[in-house]
Swiss-Prot record:
Record keywords, A-Z: 4Fe-4S, Cytoplasm, Iron, Iron-sulfur, Metal-binding, S-adenosyl-L-methionine, Transferase
Main location: cytoplasm
SUPFAM superfamilies the UniProt entry points to: Radical SAM enzymes
Protein name: Ribosomal protein uS12 methylthiotransferase RimO
GO biological process: tRNA modification
Function, in words: Catalyzes the methylthiolation of an aspartic acid residue of ribosomal protein uS12.
Residue ranges constituting the TRAM domain according to the UniProt record: 377-443
Length: 443
């Protein structure tokens, strides 16, 4: 029995879960759907079928994804599953055997083939159905720019390489073409993402490509330099702490890209870093952070850490707190270790009890709160350019160069008259709390 609706134009519903890399995958699939003449439905009822892009990184994400698939099946009945959890099709089919198809992550072609099988595409689609910048799930003034897929590292807590494969860098001319189209469409900020941003080009031995009639190496420094010519904000995420990252700091000091680094250090104890297979040394990191700030005093550093990793002792955790005190990071996120099916860390000895993992996470965040607040307080009295995200009757919400969307703080501007999302505005910082800055407009 078919549940296909009787409307003339086929409609596809879409549910996107997970990280910014998954969001980028969703945007590529949505762009293909629109290019082929499908309409995107905002409701289950109006859709002929539903695509669910899943996350499978931790147990909570698996549960959320399975729940989303179940909801789509209950409300619509015709569901195609893609994304990271799709790499474990046995898990999906055991829970929901009635799904139409399952693909892994970064699988636009496979998703489109499944859509074609179950919902034939309309005749004579027109390319002008799709804007040059493609279909996006983010607000109009910022966008994610994915530069590679997969990862060559084998961190013991992570299963991404088993789901997304080894590093595959996008050709630099493809990345720049997408970036230019986004800038031309009015995007004011590009957030550069991948599993391992600083490894860009390693897999192709930094092959030389061409952009704007000039040779450009497939390398993060060269890409950042080229992106900096677009005249919009460029923000770097998921930067593995390679020595080559040092080359980006002068570009930040010159104002070519934002003075912002999202570097997932994960821990500071040499013993735990070794167990994680993370090739970092806390003393070396501290020296590099010092040099980065010497070159670019306005640099904002965000990082994430895992507490309660197997084998972590109280001494290891204290080393992590000492690192935070010395590093004076601006923004920090912390996660209590959660076993992930298929991760090598599951086989490590000396598991830390759940309550200790969570207690250490809470202690870390309390400890870091004072540091982050002091870093914000140092900005009071300074003038800076901010990017407006939202405006209502109470004023405007914006972000500084040191604030990425959704994960960092905001700049609250009481006087939002005449402002709109995507506007740049000059402000003076007047106050702060533990997360956000407060500012007045500079006339």
């Amino acid at each position: 029995m078919s549940n296909i609706k009787t409307q003339d134009v086929p409609r596809v519903g879409f549910v996107s879960l997970g990280c910014p890399k998954a969001t980028s995958d969703s945007e590529h699939i949505l762009t293909r759907l629109r290019a082929e003449g499908y309409e995107i439905s905002g409701s289950y009822d109006a859709a002929d079928l539903v695509v669910v892009n899943t996350c499978g990184f931790i147990d909570a994400a698996v549960e959320e994804s399975l729940d989303a698939i179940g909801e789509a099946l209950a409300e619509n009945g015709r569901v195609i599953v893609t994304g990271c959890l799709g790499a474990k099709d046995d898990v999906i089919l055991a829970a929901h055997p009635q799904v139409l198809a399952v693909t892994g992550p970064h699988a636009t072609e496979e998703v489109m083939q499944a859509v074609h099988r179950h919902l034939p595409k309309p005749h004579d689609p027109f390319s002008d159905l799709v804007p040059p910048q493609g279909i996006r799930l983010t607000p109009q003034h910022y966008a994610y720019l994915k530069i590679s897929e997969g990862c060559n590292h084998r961190c013991t807590f992570c299963i991404i390489p088993s789901m997304r494969g080894d590093l595959v860098s996008r050709p630099i001319h493809d990345v720049m073409r997408e970036a230019e189209a986004l800038a031309d469409a009015g995007v004011k900020e590009l957030l550069v993402i991948s599993q391992d941003t600083s490894a860009y080009g390693v897999d192709v031995k930094y092959r030389t490509g061409f952009w704007g009639g000039k040779p450009v190496k497939t390398r993060l420094y060269d890409l950042a330099n080229a992106l900096g010519e677009l005249g919009i904000w460029i923000r770097m995420h998921y930067v593995y702490p390679y020595p080559s990252v040092d080359d980006l700091i002068p570009l930040m000091a010159e104002g070519k890209i934002l003075p912002y680094l999202d570097v997932p250090f994960q821990h500071a104890s040499p013993r735990i870093l070794k167990a994680m297979k993370r090739p970092a040394n806390a003393e070396n990191v501290l020296e590099r952070v010092r040099k980065w700030r010497e070159i670019c005093p306005d640099l904002t550093i965000r990082s994430t850490f895992i507490t309660g990793f197997p084998g972590e002792t109280e001494e290891d955790f204290e080393q992590l707190l000492q690192f935070l005190e010395a590093a004076q990071l601006d923004r920090v996120g912390a996660f209590a270790y959660s076993p992930v099916e298929g991760a090598a860390a599951n086989d490590l000895p000396d598991a830390v009890p759940d309550e200790v993992r969570e207690e250490r996470r809470a202690r870390l965040m309390d400890f870091q709160e004072d540091i982050s607040t002091q870093r914000l307080e140092a900005k009071i009295g300074r003038e800076m350019t901010v990017l407006v995200d939202d405006v209502d009757e109470e004023g405007a919400l914006a972000r500084s160069p040191g604030d990425a969307p959704e994960i960092d703080g905001l700049v609250v501007i009481p006087d939002g008259e005449g402002l709109a999302p995507g506007d740049f505005v000059r402000v003076r910082i007047t106050d702060c709390d533990i997360h956000d800055l407060y500012a007045e407009r500079v006339v």
